[in-house]
Amino acid sequence: MASPPDDIAASLAAYCSFISAQNRRALEIYVPFIATAVPDDLEDDDEVEELRLDGLNTLLDTNLKDLGVSDPGEILARFDELAPKIGLDGTYVMQEHEGTSEERDAIRREYLFVIEESLKRKSREDVRDSISIPEDFRALAGLVDGIVGYGLPVFRNRAHPAFWWGCRDDLCPHAGRVMTPEDLTQHAALPECWQIAGGWAPGTGPDANFSIVYSRESDEDPWKWRYTLSTLDHGLQIFERIPEVLAWYAHFRQSDEVPGPDELDANTLLFSQI
């Protein structure tokens, strides 16, 4: 049974609030340090402001000038506005530079269409006429364009698996994310007794595979959509609803450690060597 849309929206808001707060706490250390940092052997004083923005661009995996940011202090002053635009709330939302409103809506529709059509081609024959994208996921896709997880972008991109890379096809063509039941059995790593009729891999990352699988435990059970995560460090996680996924995923591989200013290095941060 699908979750009510209001429950999905509330769980997403709680997820975003938690991750935003954690990232803001880290940026309250990084931003003031970078705003006054001066590298060794600076040849031109006029370059330092550009270096500071470059360092923040690397930390946040973005181009701050595209967002109208010209001074490091604006990141904290405008945090609530900027967080969803650069993924500091753990989501991906397409921005204006990625197309007009109509073009972005078309990208979203294309993602769902291609996934569903591929499911009907690659799933077990006895479910091909009835299989469709789970309503929970469709509701989530109406609110954001991706769910990418915990941490500042530069660190998250290296070490944190994304639950859903989103509507972009630059990482992998959408149809390529949909797998045959045989391939999903290995990818999702469900117990051998489980049966998989179809599904897809919305996201992945270091030592972790996310899967959305149409599955059942035995012939007597009905087919259900489930969200799974198979990892080396956390084993296998199985969820039946998006609110459960978001509540767990918000804390997945969470680290509360924030460096002190004395642990930061100006050259490393300003020259994008993080």
Cite the ranges covered by each PLM segment.
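Exposed regions on extracellular, virion, or secretory-pathway luminal proteins
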Residues: 123-127
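Hydrophobic alpha-helical bundle cores within soluble ligand-binding/oligomerization subdomains
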Residues: 138-141
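A C-terminal-region feature
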Residues: 1-122, 143-274
